Each structure stands twice: as C-alpha cells, then as structure tokens.
Amino acid sequence: MMIGIYIAALVIGYLFGSIPFGLILTKIAGTQDLRSIGSGNIGATNVLRTGRKGLAAATLLLDALKGTAAVIVAAYLASGTDAIAANAAMLAALGAFLGHLFPVWLKFKGGKGVAVYIGVLIGLFWPAAVVFCIMWLATAFTSRYSSLSALVASFVTPIFLWWFGHDSLASLFAVLTLLLFWMHRENIKRLQAGTESKIGQKK
C-alpha cells in the first residue's frame, strides 16, 4: 500500500512539474519559440530575453506554484500517518523537479529547475525558501548573474535544512542541488570564462 502511495506521489509530482509554462505563455503571447532564442531554455530567465518582463514574472510564479501544488496535493492524497504524508510530499517534490528538467512532452528537454526548486521548498519548509530567495537576491544584486545566484542559493539550502535538524529534507535538497548544478554545467563554464550573460542582457 505504501509503495503504491509513494509511486503515485512521484508520478503526480512529475506530471505537475512537466507542465512547460514558459513555452505555453510565450506561445499564447505570440513571441517566437522560446527554444530558439537565448539559451533555448523554457524557464523564466530565458523568457526575460524576449523583452516581456510580465511573461517572465508569470513563468517564474507558475513554475514555482506547480512545485508547491505537487507537494500539497501528494500530501493531501496520501493516507496513513504523518510520516507517510511527509514522505509522499518529498517524493512529489522530487517528481516535480524531474518533470521540469525532463518533461516527456518536450522530448525530455526542459528547464533548469530554479523556480520549481523554490516552489517545492515553499511546500515542504517555507523558511528555507525565504533563505533561498534572500541568498539569490543578494548574489544577483552584487554579481548580476542569475545562474550564479541560483547556484549559491541552492548550495546554502541543504546546509540550512541540516543545521536546523531537517535531515530528510536536507538529503532531498542535496540531491536536487546536485541536479541543479548539473543542469547549469554550461553556465558554470561560462562563469569561469567570464562569458556568462548577466541579468537583463540578451544573448
């Protein structure tokens, strides 16, 4: 029974996470295919390169909310003890993150996961999401690099969770952080080379 609940939570999370809001919104708005501009990414940072700040903000919000929704829905549907619901929520978070990174509808070529990372953090332990956002904003303000801001904030997150005794969440977000770093591997190379685009700069 528990295995079935956990598999369902993972699938629910994946389906939520695989909704490509950036692509949907830009198509509705009549802009060019998001995958053909900038980094080719379907996330909010690349949407911003279309010059449509409102669309970028909407993409960021909806991508975060799909992560939060996946966690809440999975926890609600899970029956049994609080521990089962908590485990289901964490599996849904993992599923949502993987769904955004590797959506089946887009031949497994999705986004880099920053907004979804924030969204699942909100659903699982919102104070950590506040810390993430503070670290992101502080790094962005000083460096103007969106990618570096995400890397710094995600690196701090599992440490923060572990420090405050949330070992299971710390382990989960350590995995998500490793995945996020992997998805940003080209950004890391460009940061090292000094060729990474800054916030608001078109590629």
From Swiss-Prot:
Documented EC number(s): 2.3.1.275
Record key words, sorted: Cell inner membrane, Cell membrane, Lipid biosynthesis, Lipid metabolism, Membrane, Phospholipid biosynthesis, Phospholipid metabolism, Transferase, Transmembrane, Transmembrane helix
Molecular function via GO: acyl-phosphate glycerol-3-phosphate acyltransferase activity
Pathway the protein contributes to: Lipid metabolism; phospholipid metabolism
Membrane topology: Multi-pass membrane protein
Cellular-component GO terms for this entry: plasma membrane
Major enzyme class: transferase
Stored InterPro entries: G3P_acylTferase_PlsY
Keyword Lipid metabolism: yes
Superkingdom per UniProt: Bacteria
A single GO BP: phospholipid biosynthetic process
Substrates-to-products reaction catalysed: an acyl phosphate + sn-glycerol 3-phosphate = a 1-acyl-sn-glycero-3-phosphate + phosphate
Pfam families: G3P_acyltransf (PF02660)
Subcellular location(s) of the protein: Cell inner membrane
Membrane-spanning residues: 5-25, 55-75, 84-104, 118-138, 159-179
Subunit-structure text: Probably interacts with PlsX.
Purpose of the protein: Catalyzes the transfer of an acyl group from acyl-phosphate (acyl-PO(4)) to glycerol-3-phosphate (G3P) to form lysophosphatidic acid (LPA). This enzyme utilizes acyl-phosphate as fatty acyl donor, but not acyl-CoA or acyl-ACP.
Family indicated by similarity: Belongs to the PlsY family.
UniProt cross-references to HAMAP family, sorted A to Z: PlsY
NCBIfam families: glycerol-3-phosphate 1-O-acyltransferase PlsY
Protein name, entry field: Glycerol-3-phosphate acyltransferase
Gene behind this protein: plsY
